[in-house]
């Protein structure tokens, strides 16, 4: 491995550690031969998921996403791109059969989301489920592919884990978005119509409804565990942080503004989270 590529991969690992720590711990449970791909893919997700949040102007964030959309095409055409995550992805794609479809679908979902007006909220929970599928489940599909795991059952479980994780993380992000524009862009209209979002009780009711959908996906994923190949189960360990976050939401009565949500790792002590993750990994669960 060249020094340049090693530097790019180290950058990916550090980005995941800095900005997605609970998933960083999940990736450490993967077999060594899968970690390179997994960290590169997760770093790509960080680049696209943070593009709008770190931009001083939404137009700059959108330009960044469009750049990544174009970069995926270039990577699959074996063109060199001067960006550490792109270089790591290029190496992964040259060594493994990773579908371009999943990467494109992920960044295109982010682009479509970035182009929404503040007042243009999703109409149904199903729309948010599709967004979670497109941005989170696709990441798990790509990781399975990079590990040479071809299993319909694993893909099916990954779909549900991704939806559970994606929905839970959208709920966690609600205070951030409310602080930026005073709105809750990830509470769909059909849910908002059943609750009064400008009251604490109403918002908690909406969060409970959406958290219940996320939990149902997690239960469906775990119901498939008996058919999922053993080598795929560690790829699905993001089900653990999803469960932890949903459980923390339950403990704070689904109040996303409760400061306990930001303590430790997803609201629990770091050592407890790591022990739970290790236990699930050792038992072949997710």
PLM feature spans:
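A contiguous catalytic/ligand-binding core that recognizes phosphate-bearing ligands
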Residues: 147-150, 161
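Hydrophobic alpha-helical segments and helix pairs
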Residues: 95-142, 146
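Catalytic cores of Mg2+-dependent Asp-rich isoprenoid enzymes
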Residues: 1-91, 103-110, 132-141, 154-167, ...
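Short, flexible active-site loops
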Residues: 122, 145-148, 195-200
